[in-house]
């Protein structure tokens, strides 16, 4: 019952993980890779195909496995995204190049705090030395906060328009005097409407026929990207489950991100939680 003692504990039980903890984003980061590829026109929806055999060779000693070890076969770009095919995204990353993916990270504000106005917010960890194979699927030493992922989704849902997120304008004391004013960034178009519309359609496909097809009966529809990410906690390998998306499909009103820590496989808990949120906030 000692609040101060609980707040100072190192186990993070009372830590606001949405803004002050970073996690490998896993496959939700494929949104950024896809954006880089489409915006730079290295692939197109109508011309890109990939034959997934279940893995792709990285070098003489390493290979990148797909979540479907039997292989997905020949896929369109929409199917690649819906199936979250790792070898295909490695292929896309090789076409677009690491430099352009890092530029996409910057464009989508994944390299800076969201700056809600809370002091405990931390920034992402995006080292330069991440291998292209890990970068293509959001693994390795990448660390991004859930609120940063949610802001990326918000930008996509807003047709490429960045709108600053904040929870207050100013703070006043008991004498009604302003003691702090929050300064926010200006609205800015970061992604062309054409590219953002394509990504939104791919995300809708994930909810209809892809890794989140359990969401295909949501009233109003949604667009999402799921992900699982491996990391180490207290020298123990754990898997986190992600889902980020927008709701409803027409004139989206909400960007929603769910992260389940440590016990996930194939986002099995994150997907129904996302669905429950949508069902309880639907605006009709």
Regions found by a protein language model. Give the residues of each.
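Hydrophobic alpha-helical membrane-association signature
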Residues: 148, 270-273
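Beta-lactam-recognizing serine transpeptidase/beta-lactamase-like catalytic domain environment
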Residues: 1-26, 32-260, 266
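Short, gly/Ser/Thr-rich active-site loops of penicillin-recognizing serine hydrolases
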Residues: 178-183, 272-284
């Amino acid at each position: 019952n000692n609040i101060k003692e609980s707040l100072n504990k190192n186990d993070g039980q009372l830590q606001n993980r949405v803004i002050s903890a970073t996690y490998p984003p896993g496959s939700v980061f494929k949104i950024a890779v896809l954006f880089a590829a489409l915006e730079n026109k290295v692939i197109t929806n109508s011309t890109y195909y990939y034959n997934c055999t279940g893995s792709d060779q990285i070098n003489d000693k390493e290979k990148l496995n797909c979540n479907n070890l039997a292989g997905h076969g020949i896929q369109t770009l929409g199917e690649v995204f819906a199936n979250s095919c790792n070898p295909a995204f490695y292929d896309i990353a090789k076409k677009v190049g690491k430099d352009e993916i890092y530029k996409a990270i910057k464009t989508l504000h994944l390299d800076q705090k969201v700056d809600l106005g809370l002091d405990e917010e931390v920034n992402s960890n995006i080292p330069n030395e991440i291998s292209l194979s890990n970068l293509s699927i959001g693994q390795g030493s990448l660390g991004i906060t859930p609120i940063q992922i949610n802001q990326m989704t918000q930008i996509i849902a807003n047709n490429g328009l960045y709108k600053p997120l904040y929870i207050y304008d100013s703070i006043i004391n008991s004498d009604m005097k302003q003691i702090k004013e929050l300064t926010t960034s200006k609205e800015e178009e970061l992604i062309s409407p054409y590219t953002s519309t394509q990504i939104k359609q791919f995300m809708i496909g994930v909810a209809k026929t892809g890794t989140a097809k359990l969401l295909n009966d949501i009233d109003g529809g949604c667009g999402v990207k799921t992900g699982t990410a491996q990391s180490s906690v207290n020298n123990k390998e754990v898997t986190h489950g992600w889902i980020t998306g927008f709701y409803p499909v027409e004139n989206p009103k909400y960007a929603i991100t769910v992260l389940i820590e440590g016990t996930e496989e194939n986002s099995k808990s994150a997907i129904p939680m996302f669905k429950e949120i949508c069902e309880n906030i639907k605006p009709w």
